[in-house]
Amino acid sequence: MTLLNISGLSHHYAHGGFNGKHQHQAVLNNVSLTLKSGETVALLGRSGCGKSTLARLLVGLESPAQGNISWRGEPLAKLNRAQRKAFRRDIQMVFQDSISAVNPRKTVREILREPMRHLLSLKKSEQLARASEMLKAVDLDDSVLDKRPPQLSGGQLQRVCLARALAVEPKLLILDEAVSNLDLVLQAGVIRLLKKLQQQFGTACLFITHDLRLVERFCQRVMVMDNGQIVETQVVGEKLTFSSDAGRVLQNAVLPAFPVRRRTTEKV
């Protein structure tokens, strides 16, 4: 089943010029893609290529300058109030900047309960039980429930944001560099959790990343973005080889898993 369909998406930002006139900076140019239920897809690209802007458009935080975004066959622009509430529940996003994504005055308990209070019909006791369950799933415990964001490490806060997104059992989870910043042990645990959710609920995942290792370990398909355009789409297999210049640059930037001894012909 197709969850998300994007066709001919373009976007720009206006900014003031030296002459006082507004100028438009193109960020996305004619982007089209589809995401299906249970699918794991990566959007790979260097910083500043338009990945995060695309993510903001997908979840409805901004409206595109041109093009169409449809969720389960319905254009986002035409969703009624009930459909929009269901959409906010079904598609969740975890941002790279976890500090800006939460209210620093709220406790972790309040942060986790917030989407459940607005998007689910659960009693308070059920919300608290699910909050504890989600914390455990991201390798945290109830000891953080009464803490506030400034009292947590960056990795802990990132996992709280992930737990918050998972609490409403979304159909699509968008992770904007949200897993790349975790250490490898935590990253592996989160990936196991996401795989379990896919099997249980058919949750689709869109990884917005520049981390090629993450793509190779978890994703079924990868799209390469460069200068606001998707320049290549590949199925992830045993050996991932890119044909675009942007894809090859990212692939060549990955360090080998083990040090490679440099051969020399010089005699000592």
Swiss-Prot record:
GO terms of biological process kind: DNA damage response; nickel cation import across plasma membrane
Pfam families assigned: ABC_tran (PF00005)
An MF annotation (GO) of this entry: ATP hydrolysis activity
Membrane topology: Peripheral membrane protein
Compartment annotation: Cell inner membrane
A cellular-component GO term for this protein: ATP-binding cassette (ABC) transporter complex, substrate-binding subunit-containing
SUPFAM superfamilies tied to this protein: P-loop containing nucleoside triphosphate hydrolases
Enzyme Commission number(s): 7.2.2.11
Catalytic reaction(s) noted: Ni(2+)(out) + ATP + H2O = Ni(2+)(in) + ADP + phosphate + H(+)
UniProt entry tagged with the keyword Transferase: no
CDD domains recorded: ABC_NikE_OppD_transporters (cd03257)
InterPro entries linked: AAA+_ATPase, ABC_transp_ATP-bind, ABC_transporter-like_ATP-bd, ABC_transporter-like_CS, Nickel_NikE, P-loop_NTPase
Key word NADP present: no
Keywords: ATP-binding, Cell inner membrane, Cell membrane, Ion transport, Membrane, Nickel, Nickel transport, Nucleotide-binding, Translocase, Transport
Residues of the ABC transporter domain: 4-252
Main subcellular location: membrane
Binding sites annotated in the UniProt record for ATP: 45-52
Job of this protein: Part of the ABC transporter complex NikABCDE involved in nickel import. Responsible for energy coupling to the transport system.
Family, per entry: Belongs to the ABC transporter superfamily. Nickel importer (TC 3.A.1.5.3) family.
Subunit structure: The complex is composed of two ATP-binding proteins (NikD and NikE), two transmembrane proteins (NikB and NikC) and a solute-binding protein (NikA).
Name this polypeptide is given: Nickel import ATP-binding protein NikE
